[in-house]
């Protein structure tokens, strides 16, 4: 019987919207799992990413950005998901952006002060700071906010110092059996990952034109006789005008979204994919908690 020790633990990645949490997770895992886009609030579910290296297994919880506005049902549920992630982990990575400090950062910090888990502060996008002389005083300001386990300036985009974060994580994993097989990257279903890929392309190609009132349901996900997948995706928007926006002139926009989403799916699933997309108006879904539950927004709370 093998007596080799193994180490395993949960790590929450927290921070206000759009500071680079998903990009950091993807870099830590070495591949794209969490949806990344320049728009705030693109992560809506607690995606678990798993990184196994030898005896070490780090299980990352990628939270929605904690933010102060809680007006709509979807925002309330996103905040609840983020707060619940903080409560049951061995370690927290708190991501902030360059020399910016906002009331939202302060709110996240206050939640962390109440927690028991040690906190690594990841100061992201330091490569984008114009006035380098401002960086050191800002790092000192951050160091005075709470007793951080470590403060690491990083660039999640380029990967700078991400290995330092990974090293600190490994050191703090408790001795435990691995929760997942070593080839697992995420515990989310392929159906869920397909919907996230489509949603990322919507964010990417529609940019600021489309509000957050868009979601994706996978209505069909089956293996075909060619050894690939037939996937039907339903894009839900709140208004007729948004539907036209998603479809684009003579269907050009939805065609581009479909082509790019299919490429990513084929890479992730390592199999040919036949993807069909439809757009449907379902008004008020972002305000209706029952509708959100039916779309899986609270399946993990």
Swiss-Prot record:
Subcellular location, record wording: Cytoplasm; Cell inner membrane
UniProt-annotated stretches for the region G4: 124-127
SUPFAM superfamilies documented for this protein: P-loop containing nucleoside triphosphate hydrolases, Prokaryotic type KH domain (KH-domain type II)
Era-type G domain segment(s): 7-175
Record region (G2): 41-45
Region ranges (G3): 62-65
Chain positions recorded as GTP binding sites: 15-22, 62-66, 124-127
One GO MF term: small ribosomal subunit rRNA binding
Domain KH type-2 per the UniProt entry, residue ranges: 206-283
Record's keyword terms, sorted: Cell inner membrane, Cell membrane, Cytoplasm, GTP-binding, Membrane, Nucleotide-binding, Ribosome biogenesis, RNA-binding, rRNA-binding
Membrane topology of this protein: Peripheral membrane protein
Record region (G1): 15-22
Transmembrane segments: none
Region (G5): 154-156
UniProt record, GO biological process: ribosomal small subunit assembly
GO cellular component: cytosol; plasma membrane
Pfam family for this entry, one: MMR_HSR1
Protein family per UniProt: Belongs to the TRAFAC class TrmE-Era-EngA-EngB-Septin-like GTPase superfamily. Era GTPase family.
HAMAP family per record: GTPase_Era
Subunit structure: Monomer.
Biological role stated in the UniProt entry: An essential GTPase that binds both GDP and GTP, with rapid nucleotide exchange. Plays a role in 16S rRNA processing and 30S ribosomal subunit biogenesis and possibly also in cell cycle regulation and energy metabolism.
Name by which UniProt lists this protein: GTPase Era
Lineage, opening ranks: Bacteria, Pseudomonadati, Pseudomonadota, Gammaproteobacteria, Enterobacterales
């Amino acid at each position: 019987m093998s007596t080799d020790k193994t180490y395993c633990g949960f790590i929450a990645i927290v921070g206000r919207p759009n500071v680079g949490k998903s990009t950091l997770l993807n870099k830590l895992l070495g591949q794209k799992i969490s949806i990344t886009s320049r728009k705030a609030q693109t992560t809506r579910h607690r995606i678990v990413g798993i990184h196994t290296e030898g005896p070490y297994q780090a299980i990352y919880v990628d939270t929605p950005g904690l933010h102060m506005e809680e007006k709509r049902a979807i925002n309330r549920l996103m905040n609840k998901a983020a707060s619940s992630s903080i409560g049951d982990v061995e370690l927290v990575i708190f991501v902030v952006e360059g020399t910016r400090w906002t009331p939202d950062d302060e709110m996240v910090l206050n939640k962390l002060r109440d927690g028991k888990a040690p906190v690594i502060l990841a100061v992201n996008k330091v490569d984008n700071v114009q006035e380098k002389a401002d960086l050191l005083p800002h790092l000192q300001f951050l160091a005075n906010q709470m007793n951080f386990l470590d403060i690491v300036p990083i660039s999640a985009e380029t990967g700078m110092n991400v290995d330092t974060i990974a090293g600190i994580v490994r050191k703090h994993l408790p001795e435990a059996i691995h929760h997942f097989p070593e080839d697992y990257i995420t515990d989310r279903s392929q159906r869920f990952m397909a919907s996230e890929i489509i949603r990322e392309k919507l964010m990417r190609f529609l940019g600021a034109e489309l509000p957050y009132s868009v979601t994706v349901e996978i209505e069909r996900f089956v293996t075909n006789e060619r050894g690939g997948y037939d996937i039907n995706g339903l894009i839900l928007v709140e208004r007729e005008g948004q539907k036209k926006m998603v479809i684009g002139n003579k269907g050009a926009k939805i065609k581009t979204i479909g082509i790019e989403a299919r490429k990513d799916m084929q890479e992730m699933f390592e199999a040919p994919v036949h993807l069909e997309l439809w757009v449907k108006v379902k008004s008020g879904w972002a305000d209706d908690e029952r509708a959100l539950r039916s779309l899986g927004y609270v399946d993990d709370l």
